[in-house]
Structure formats: structure tokens, C-alpha cells
Amino acid sequence: MGKIVNLLKHSNSTIVNLRHFSGNALLVMTLFFSAIGCKNGIKNDLVKQAKPTIMVIPSDNLLKKNDALKKEIIDGADIYIRDYNCYLINDTKSKTAISIIQKAFIDAGYPLNDLDKNLKQLNDRSLRDEADGVKKDAKTLLLESVQPDIIIELDYSFDMDMNSRNFDREISYTLTAIDAYTNKVFSSNVYSGGKGQDFRTAFEDAIDDKIGTMMSEIDNYFGDIIENGREITVQFNIDRNSTIKLSDTYSSTGESYSEWIQDYMDYYTINGTYKLERNSDYEMHFVNVRIPTQKENGTQLNALGWARQCVKEMREKLKISSSNRAQGLSEVVITIK
């Protein structure tokens, strides 16, 4: 058995002389590698079976057509304010289309966040945020409160077919899959050519043409997240009233705060996956950061939880105070005071 352990330690050997092992040792070795293969197989199965939480929302184009998308200038920046309640009242067909898409995902086993049901809670929270002087639109509030994994944006048209003798309408739609955490578009499926007079019947027939392809693309994308971690951005900066610089040393070994941060990033990311984009005395900015989707105890881990743990470690090990000032699902902004 000792020879097997030594062999596993020296993995540079590509050829094994089986005559060096007894029959029992070969049996143990076979069982060992079979167990590894079984474990990897279970992991792969879990990745394949994992389903992201879905939320279906109307596109900005549909909101604009129904006067439910406004542009405001806040602190010199263009901010788009989305009114989903107004839109769903003005466009009843969209409510039908969303329910058909949702049913398809539910039937396929996906967890779902229902837009209509969450709007009441959203309105209550919006009132509280406005009382606090914080202006946020419906989409931002939805993502922060509901936290779906994937957003499906729907855009559609149901216009009269001028060439039809039966007064048919022609249906077309676009389904866009977006990572709710990074706002990255990873799938877009366009359909056109369906005809009919009843919207529900026409849309049910049309959705079957693309929904299977989109589900496969979603599964592949989410499988990568489960296996390789969720992508976020991480920024460390120094508060304007602080006397600390990231290049300052914090211990007798001469290690700087920036070196500690890089060591932390190496340890608390998936396979040390990140890119240091900016590095100065007052800021370190990391992109393409991959963090686990779960903690060691099996509970979910998001950017907020990751930042909370980092702030705690900095307080305990560096003896400095810091806070996470980020807004959004995929952003960490730790400010050192």
C-alpha cells in the first residue's frame, strides 16, 4: 500500500510497472481510482442537474412602446426608470406571453421568480427607499430583492399580416437570457413567421420553436457557474479620510496591505481566478473574479456574503476597519477607513 501512496505522490510518472505490485495492491489501486471516477461522475451529474432560478421580464423596447420607460438625469448621469406595473396594465398580451414562458420553465423543473407576484413587495420597498432619499428603478429593486440567477427578457410583436386573406396576424419574438449578477447576455433566440388570430394560441405554438434551445444554453452556462464559480468584480479602496496606503506594511514581516489582499484573492477565489486591472496606493480593482456559489456548510454564497467574510478577516487579522459599499449583485467595493 505504501508503494501506491508513493506512486500517487509522484504523479510525473506516466507509465506504471504493474509487476511491482501484489494482487491485493492492484485491487486496492483499482478501487481507489474507481472511487475517484465515481466521485467525479457524481459531481458532473450534480452540475448537469442544477437549475438556475429564472425571472421573465419585458424588454426595455416593450416598456418604451407603452410609455413605461422614462429617462431622468440624476447627479449628471442618465438613469432609466422602469414602470412594470404601468406596462402590464397597458399591454395585457405581454402578461399572457410571460405566463406561457414561465409555465414552460416550471414544467422543465426550473425554480421561478414570478414578476407579477413580486411587484407588490417591490412597491412597498420602493416607498421605503424613496423615504430614505434613495432613487432606484423597478429592475434594480427586483434584482436586489428577488436575486434570480438568470433574467429572460421578452420582446415581441403581433402585427396584422397584410398578405393574409383571413386577417391573420404575424407573431415574432426575441428571448434574451442575461446573467442577473453580471448583466452579461449569453443567449438570444429570435423567432418570426408564426401566424394566427388568437394571441395565446399563436404564442404557445411559436414558443415551442425556441424554448428548448434556450434551456440548453442556460443549462450549459449555469453548469459552468456551478463548476467554476460565479463571476464578480472586487474593488478595494482607501477612504479619503484614512491615513493608510495599500503599500504600507502591517506586520513585522514587512508584508503590505496590497500583498495581503492578493493572497486573500488567491485563496478565496476558484483556482485563483481573477484579473488585477488597477493597482495603486489607494485602489486595487479586480475583474473576472470567480467565487464559489456555496459556503462550506452548503448554504448559498453571493458577492455580499463574500465581502462580509473579507471585511471580517481584515478586522481580525489586519486590525483595520472597512465596509462594503457596493450596490448590485455582482459588485464588491470594500472601503478601508
Which residues does each PLM region occupy?
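Bacterial Sec-dependent N-terminal signal peptides
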Residues: 1-46
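C-terminal/domain-edge helix-coil "capping" segments
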Residues: 39-67, 184-275, 306, 310, ...
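Catalytic micro-motifs at enzyme active sites that drive phosphoryl/nucleotidyl and oxygen chemistry
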Residues: 42-44, 138-142, 158-166
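Extracytoplasmic
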Residues: 49-51, 92, 96, 145-151, ...
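Solvent-exposed coil/turn segments that connect beta secondary-structure elements
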Residues: 59-62, 118, 157-159, 176, ...
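Extracytoplasmic/secreted cell-surface and envelope-processing proteins
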Residues: 64-66, 122-125, 161-165, 244
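N-terminal segment of the mature soluble domain
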Residues: 65-151, 255-315
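Amphipathic beta-strand/beta-sheet edge segments enriched in Tyr/Trp
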Residues: 150-196, 331-337
